Amino acid sequence: MLKKNIYLITPNTLNKSFYYFLPKLLKTKRIKYLQIRLKNLSKKKLVQEIKKIKKIVNKKTKIIINDFPEIASLLNCDGCHVGQKDKEISLVKKKFKTLKIVGVTCHNSKKIALSSVKKGASYVAFGSFYKTNTKKT
């Protein structure tokens, strides 16, 4: 049987509830990837939050940083996730060789997905499939 894992993405703001539930979710051993997606923070505050999260996350869960490969590399995270308007995948892979994973957003475009894979993306993300307020920030 195919083992099912979860790719968890943080909410845009982290509160006590997030830090309460994160260890409980990690104990299920089903969270294979945790994408830290905090678009409204300064880089300094983002670094602080990543360090705090890294103390909680086990080695089996890969930490992916949204939009900032330089921070992901600096903090020895497993990878980064970039959007279409962010840095070019091939440049990220060339400049930040320590990042094992470089993912990219493809929205709903098969063409972008195929192009991203050719450029070296570790994975492609599609969505959102339903109307959401998440992508507004």
Task: Locate each region found by the language model.
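Conserved N-terminal beta1-alpha1 strand-loop-helix module at the mouth
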Residues: M1-Y123
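A short acidic, helix-capping loop that chelates divalent metal ions and anchors anionic groups
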Residues: A72, Y130-K136
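Short, intrinsically disordered, charge-balanced linker/junction segments flanking boundaries
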Residues: V124-A125, K135-T137
